[in-house]
Amino acid sequence: MRQNIHSVKAKNIKIGTRDSELALWQAHTVAKQLNDLGHETEIIAVKSQGDILLDKPLYELGITGIFTKTLDIAMINGQIDIAVHSMKDVPTALPTGMMQAAVLKRANEKDIMVYNNNLDFLDAEGTIATGSLRRQAMWLSKYPNHRVVDLRGNVNTRLQKLKDNDWHGAIFAAAGLERLGFINNGNVIKSPSFVGAGKALDWMIPSPAQGAMVIHAMQRDEYSKNAVAELNDLETDICTYIERQFLKTLEGGCTAPIGALAAFADDKISFKGILLSIDGKQKIEVDKIVPIQEWKKLGYNLAQEILNNGGIELMSTIKNSLKK
């Protein structure tokens, strides 16, 4: 049973975050919301392994929680009280004693392609940059004649790399660009390092929980978890739960080519999910609308549908490919 926050001794809530511009934006957003509710906060930034190890694709590093582990350790050691994450980066299993304390209202869940000149390359041969296996697989499934190159780093770094190379475009999470104020008038991308255009990829099924921010706290920390609970958005909480349950059932971790999107539709929930081979040549999809009361096992049930439709073999192939 959750204690009344006024019955627990107040404290300055130490907010842990990665030190990238986007992560700091997220942490300051949480701090402001907590401040508005009367809580005192302090932001503590750390550098994650994922921000340091930039010379290899994420899937080759083989590190679970590469963007979250440093903050997990800081929280367990009492250096921070809560941690703010992009939810799509969070492993489906949390460390012992840690809990998901709140999910903030979801922003734009879509992917967007940022490009330099024009879109003529879409009908010819092209080179697209992304560090995501899901984006790579979905792009190659739609554009099999294209080449995909690896792209790592924070948002500004990736935009700079796009400017410096002869790639035709690069794929980003739209929410990140919007949060940093880099999208103007719908499709103009403008940052300190890049000016170009963007095209929303409405056909691309996003990463589970893309566009959502999550806050973790220790289960024993009554004050912090109760304070943060006031920020929870129930609709986003339910939708991301379904998507991550789908991911966990497929055993995809954060790097396999898996997409999932749940959304409320009146008194129903719509769900789209996909599992692809790394080269995009194979894919298994589900697309369902179900009564809202079925949400608790929806992700599991639809993942089982994919597994029973060739997904077991495809997941085995993917895992073997990633081991090479």
Mark where each language-model region is:
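Structured loop/turn residues at beta-strand edges in well-structured enzyme cores
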Residues: 78, 124, 165
